[in-house]
Amino acid sequence: SETGNTVTVKGFSPLR
């Protein structure tokens, strides 16, 4: 959740 959006299984937002 670097962008503060929904966290995925990768730990980052879906926009990334």
UniProtKB/Swiss-Prot annotation:
Q: Which domain of life is it from?
A: Eukaryota
Q: What's in the GO CC field?
A: extracellular space
Molecular function GO terms recorded: toxin activity
Q: Which UniProt keywords apply?
A: Bradykinin receptor impairing toxin, G-protein coupled receptor impairing toxin, Secreted, Toxin
Q: Where in the cell is it found?
A: Secreted
The record's account of tissue expression is: Expressed by the venom gland.
Biological role: Inhibits angiotensin-converting enzyme (ACE) with a Ki of 61.8 uM, and targets B1 bradykinin receptors (BDKRB1). In vivo, induces hyperalgesic effects in living rats after intraplantar injection.
User: Which family does the record assign?
Assistant: Belongs to the bradykinin-related peptide family.
What else does UniProt say about it? Is hydrolyzed by angiotensin-converting enzyme (ACE) by only 6.7% (compared to bradykinin). Is neither able to contract smooth muscle preparation (ileum), not to potentiate bradykinin and does not provoke inflammation in rats.
Its name, as the record gives it, is Bradykinin-related peptide Cd-146
Q: Which organism is it from?
A: Cyphononyx dorsalis (Spider wasp)
